[in-house]
Amino acid sequence: MKVLCLGGAGKICREAAYDLVEFSNFKTITIGDYNESAGREVVEWLNDPRVDFKRVDVNNKEETVKLMQEHDIVMDGTTLSLNDQSTACMAEAGCHGINLNGFGDEYKYDREFKNRGKTHVPGFGMTPGTTDMMVKYAADQMETVEIVRVSHGAFRPIAFSASITETTTYEYDPNLPGRVVYEDGKFIQVEPFARPREIRLPRPYGTHSQYIIPHAETKTAAQYLSHKGVRLIEVRGTWPPKNMQLIKALYDWGFMRNDKVKVGNVEVGIMDAIGRYLMQAPEGQTTDLYGYALHVEVIGTKGGKKIQHILTHTHPASDGSVKGWEKLRAYTRCVGIPMAIGTQMIASGKIKMKGVIIPEFAF
């Protein structure tokens, strides 16, 4: 079996590739990336004879499809703005797929994947991904489900990669239609910083105000739990306090609209400029506490009694006391490992459903 790690030079996808090297039976693990120097650096870091590098530009569909056709599955770590193109390439190439974001562009390719007898699972990192499994674990123990609240703390620098910078701008876009809650059978659009709720995360992360965010779990959980009468689904998140302070100020002052401004003879989106600055500034590349913590609450009934499940997640300390989990790797490994596990499960034939499948049905 051969796997193509698309965007494999990225900080998160390389961790998924590392997990495949450590635990999978793939005969070939190809790092596919536009950035050749970073990609070859990952190959050297992984130091395994099964690993090679192929340069690929997802915007070049013909080239990308040809490369994908040489592989059984694509583990897609590209940015959310590229997921439409990358999924289209997988569908045409006739290979299995999985990605991190799951924001919705992938589902329009369902028929193509079904026709080719292939499976694609969008949104399988930490959030969405592991959170979907936590909701499913709790809900499957209940006869009816009334409330689902998914919350997370992503403790990472605000702009350590292009993908993360893009995600930050996307999630707090004031006009984003996908920032919704599910309430009494309807998806209701809400503004940034809507419905604040204090969430107590596992140590060392503590209690933080969290706000509604545009994540796939709202829609996938609604689909999975439709037969159990679910009335409310809310997905919240937070970043380090300094990050949230900055995003709130940018939102209050209108920067998050990303209006075009003229600088000299050049016109640029103001958030695009701020994002580029943060990617080059030390303040955008570091944070005080690293890692990822999840908190999932599911309320329902069993045997005629009302019950509540609260599930949490954490990981080895990021302070250097545990090798391989130092600082940023405590965050990136948390996101990469679930995608690697999902990749192995799909490639090994454990997922019988074909088409583009939500995580709750796939796993």
Language model segments and positions:
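N-terminal Rossmann NAD(P)H-binding glycine-rich loop of SDR-like oxidoreductase domains
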Residues: C5-D19
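Rossmann-fold NAD(P)-binding glycine/threonine-rich loop
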Residues: N101-H120
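N-terminal Rossmann-like NAD(P) cofactor-binding module of classical short-chain dehydrogenase/reductase
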Residues: M68, D72-G77, G97-N99
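Conserved Rossmann-fold cofactor-binding substructure of NAD(P)-dependent oxidoreductases
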Residues: D57-E70
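C-terminal catalytic/substrate-binding lobe primarily of soluble NAD(P)-dependent oxidoreductases
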Residues: Q141-F363
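ADP-ribose/adenylate-binding Rossmann-like module
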Residues: C89-Y107
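Helix N-cap at the beta1-alpha1 junction of Rossmann-like dinucleotide-binding domains, i.e.
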Residues: G10, N35-S37
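Rossmann-fold cofactor-recognition segment
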Residues: L46-N60
